[in-house]
Every structure is written in structure tokens, then in C-alpha cells.
Amino acid sequence: AITGNVSLEQLGRDSFQEIDIAGVTMPITKHNYIVKSVGELAHTVREAFYYAASGRRGPILIDIPKNIFDESCDYVPASRRAPFKPAPNASGLRDAAAVLAAAKRPFLCGGGGIISAGAAKEFRVFAERLQAPVGLTAMGIGAFPRDHVLCTGVVGMHPSAYTCDAMRGCDLFVGVGTRFSERLMANVNGYSPEAKILHIDIDASEIGKNAAVSAAVCGDLAGDGDDPAGEACLPAGLFRRHSGACGVKCDDEPLLFLSHCSASSRTAAMAASVSSSVL
């Protein structure tokens, strides 16, 4: 965002129409600038685009005082810097692989970070190899096909019944690109009482902020070509373990789907009971 302000010599004097826009927007921006000379304007704009797209994407504000618009300078072209994308560290991937290998009823939750990172392909590969039910936050809608056999629907404030049962019964909750805000789950222990949490996110400040995690992977898991980085988290044998649910669509065969994805003995027994009574 680019804003205008009073001239530099009028800043800090309670001038007419002056506003500390940098201070006002600080809580809602990733970074902001006040341009002090026309010579630094081009560099500031380039740097703003770099920081906006690096790591977790976010808004940048550039405040330009009035007198800067009246000045001129020579424009010096510069090459574009590629955004910084932190790679996941090896120890985090090992910890993730360990909790995934131990899980019997994992549940995947896809958030808006998947869309921001352009990692929908990698997330789908991850889910299909794991063969676990997948729910999407409101910001994550579009990160995974809604008509996919593994998709349970939306999680959070307005979830589907299948999503609730899958979350309540899982023994490992895998949050990918989500902040675990109250819109997702106000009480982690209440929603998934038996579950450990694996958090995968590009922003280190979000890890463990709203939910205690058993393992975490911090970095950009978007891969190149046919080798998605997310596959590094998947131990061999997970596909075989959960292959029984392959081809079962929650909307078409919800009872079979729930018997796979729910760890709750009560829910599993209910599903079996209802299934036998229907048959």
C-alpha cells in the first residue's frame, strides 16, 4: 500500500491532515516505510515487494511525504531479488516423520498458507500418500479438491459432521499452513482430546503460539518438479496402513469413511451399529 502524508518538515508537529500512518498500521502490516528522500524511493519499492513475498506473505506500507512528489532524480534500473523461502530443517522433518509413523488415525488440516505458498500440489501428494481424511479452514478452501475422496469439508466454526468426528477421533492432528486460531479450534484439547499435534508452517512465530505441538516443521514445503518436499515427512508403510480407506468418499459412504477416520470407539461402534441396521 502507498499512502501520502504532509511534507517532511511538517511531520511530528500536529499539522493539518497529518497522521502517523506508520504507527497506526504497524499491528496490521508486515513492515512499513517513510520515504525521506526521492533518491531512496525506487529502492524502497523494490525492497517492499521483496519482503512482502518472502517467508509468510504480508502487506507492506510505503508512506510518501508531499514534498517527495515535487522532487526528481535519476532512475537506476536494478535486477529483481527472488523472494526468500526458508527450507525446512532436517531435524524438523525427522520429528515429523516419527510422529507420522506412530500415528494410526491422522487427520490433515489445510490452511490458507498452502494457497499463499502455491503448495496445493504438494499438499495433495502428502494427503494421498498418507491416505488420511482432510479438512480445510475457511482460508484454506481451494487448497484441496472438495470432491476428493479424502476431503471431509470445512473445519472450524462451521464444520461438517464428518469433519467433527474425524477431528474428535484422530490421534494425530496435522495442521499445514494454519495458525490454529480460535476460528479453527477454540480449545484444542476439547476438539481432539487424544491427538498429538504436528504443525507445518512457513512462519516460525506461529509454531506453538496457539497450540502445544509434539513436532513441527518450519519452512516452505513447496517442491519443484516431481519431488515435493512434503514427501520427506512420509515414512514408507503409511500408504499400506491406511489404504483401506482409499476410494471411500465421505459424502457417498459416510459410515465406511467414519469407521476409518475416527479413533473414537463410541463413534466407530455407532457407525457399525447403524450400518448393520441399515443392511
Regions found by a protein language model. Give the residues of each.
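Short hydrophobic targeting helices and cationic amphipathic motifs
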Residues: 243, 258-261
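Compositionally biased, low-complexity intrinsically disordered regions
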Residues: 242-243, 247, 269, 273
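N-terminal alpha/beta PP-like core and its mobile active-site loop of ThDP/TPP-dependent enzymes
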Residues: 1-228, 256, 269-273
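Hydrophobic helix segments
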Residues: 229-232, 258-259, 276
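Cofactor-binding active-site loop characterized by glycine-rich and histidine/acidic residues
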Residues: 279
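Low-complexity, glycine/proline/serine-enriched flexible coil segments
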Residues: 235-239, 249-258
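Alpha-helix boundary/capping motif
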Residues: 227-232, 250-253, 263, 267-271
